Amino acid sequence: MKASMFLALAGLALLFVVCYASESEEKEFSNELLSSVLAVDDNSKGEERECLGFGKGCNPSNDQCCKSSNLVCSRKHRWCKYEIGK
């Protein structure tokens, strides 16, 4: 009876260690994945766009909206919108 209790407790302890180790690996993987995503995001911040995209805030006196996409800076709303009719 004592031997079976000892084996059961040893089995539970082993199961705990295995589960804890696999959970630690999962956390490390998710942390690495998150770090790589944030690193890619930081790299893209360094690259300034030459023009502003749709819905981006702008200044009508200094229109920096993308002309190639038919965007203009709205004087009323102060954001880049599509110019219709041209």
Curated annotation (Swiss-Prot):
UniProt entry keywords in alphabetical sequence: Amidation, Disulfide bond, Ion channel impairing toxin, Knottin, Neurotoxin, Presynaptic neurotoxin, Secreted, Signal, Toxin, Voltage-gated sodium channel impairing toxin
Q: List the disulfide bonds.
A: C51-C66, C58-C73, C65-C80
| Sites bearing Isoleucine amide, chain numbering | I84
Q: Does the keyword Secreted belong to this entry?
A: yes
Give the propeptide segment as residue ranges: 22-49
Q: What does this protein do?
A: Neurotoxin that selectively inhibits neuronal tetrodotoxin-sensitive voltage-gated sodium channels (Nav) (IC(50)=44.6 nM). It is active on Nav1.2/SCN2A (IC(50)=22.4 nM), Nav1.6/SCN8A (IC(50)=50.1 nM) and Nav1.7/SCN9A (IC(50)=48.9 nM). It shows low affinity for lipid bilayers.
What does the entry note on its domains?
Answer: The presence of a 'disulfide through disulfide knot' structurally defines this protein as a knottin.
- What does the record's miscellaneous section state? Negative results: does not affect tetrodotoxin-resistant voltage-gated sodium channels or calcium channels.
The name under which this protein is listed is: Mu-theraphotoxin-Hhn1b 1
